[in-house]
């Protein structure tokens, strides 16, 4: 331990060990925190169309447009180890061809420092809600759920589902007008 390089190496190794221990401490202090909050989802309008599907055989598929409201207070999720939240609204339903279908309709990233209270009114689907067939027409159990990924500074990336969902009955007829 006489040379400058060996002393610098020892100092660097010790500093790296201390930083690793501090990072683990940051992770362990928030690892078991409950990240679920109450969520209120309301659907004000569902529009259903039967359109030509250009992704496969030339058959027609169901395309839905959903207008919804979301209310949630995500303030309690944010602590010193949360960098951001990735929120997404998904629809789950079953058809005769598929036991479980999951479609993401909308998403949003909330950074630390942004307003974590959601009061969203008359939001439209951000992404197309296609069914690979005609499974949406008359479907009585399409469930909308708000979920989020907590992106931490250190630690695991948990997937959390909000404690509130909405089951929406879809219409029995297709809309033919071009209003949305």
Swiss-Prot record:
Taken from the record's topology, the Cytoplasmic segments are 1-11
Annotated Gene Ontology cellular component terms: signal peptidase complex
Residues passing through the membrane, by range: 12-32
- The answer on whether this UniProt entry bears the keyword Oxidoreductase reads no
Keywords assigned by UniProt? Endoplasmic reticulum, Glycoprotein, Membrane, Signal-anchor, Transmembrane, Transmembrane helix
- Indicate which residues are glycosylated according to the record: 141
What subcellular compartments does it reside in?
A: Endoplasmic reticulum membrane
Under the heading InterPro entries, the entry gives: SPC3
Membrane-side (Lumenal) residue stretches = 33-180
Q: Which domain of life is it from?
A: Eukaryota
* Primary location class: endoplasmic reticulum
Report if keyword Transmembrane helix is assigned: yes
Q: How does it sit in the membrane?
A: Single-pass type II membrane protein
Q: Which tissues is this protein detected in according to the database? A: Expressed in hen oviduct (at protein level).
Q: Which GO terms describe its biological process?
A: protein targeting to ER; signal peptide processing
Pfam families tied to this protein: SPC22
Family as reported in the entry's similarity comment = Belongs to the SPCS3 family.
Its annotated function is as follows: Essential component of the signal peptidase complex (SPC) which catalyzes the cleavage of N-terminal signal sequences from nascent proteins as they are translocated into the lumen of the endoplasmic reticulum. Essential for the SPC catalytic activity, possibly by stabilizing and positioning the active center of the complex close to the lumenal surface.
According to the record's subunit comment, the protein's assembly and interactions are: Component of the signal peptidase complex paralog A (SPC-A) composed of a catalytic subunit SEC11A and three accessory subunits SPCS1, SPCS2 and SPCS3. Component of the signal peptidase complex paralog C (SPC-C) composed of a catalytic subunit SEC11C and three accessory subunits SPCS1, SPCS2 and SPCS3. The complex induces a local thinning of the ER membrane which is used to measure the length of the signal peptide (SP) h-region of protein substrates. This ensures the selectivity of the complex towards h-regions shorter than 18-20 amino acids.
Q: What is this protein called?
A: Signal peptidase complex subunit 3
Organismal lineage = Eukaryota, Metazoa, Chordata, Craniata, Vertebrata
């Amino acid at each position: 331990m006489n040379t400058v390089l060996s002393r610098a190496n020892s100092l660097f190794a010790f500093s790296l060990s201390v930083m690793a221990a501090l990072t683990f401490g940051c992770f362990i202090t928030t690892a078991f925190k409950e990240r679920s909050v109450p969520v209120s989802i309301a659907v004000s309008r569902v529009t259903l169309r039967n359109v030509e599907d250009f992704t496969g055989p030339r058959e027609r598929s169901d395309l839905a447009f959903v207008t919804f409201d979301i209310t949630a207070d995500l303030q309690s999720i944010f602590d010193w180890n949360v960098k951001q939240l990735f929120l997404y609204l998904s629809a789950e339903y079953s058809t005769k061809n598929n036991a479980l279908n999951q479609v993401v309709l909308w998403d949003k990233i909330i950074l630390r420092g942004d307003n974590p209270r959601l009061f969203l009114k008359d939001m439209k689907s951000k992404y197309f809600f296609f069914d690979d067939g005609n499974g949406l027409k008359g479907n009585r159990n399409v469930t909308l759920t708000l979920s989020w990924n907590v992106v931490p500074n250190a630690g695991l990336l948990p997937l959390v589902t909000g404690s509130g969902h909405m089951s929406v009955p879809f219409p029995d007829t297709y809309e033919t007008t071009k209003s949305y």
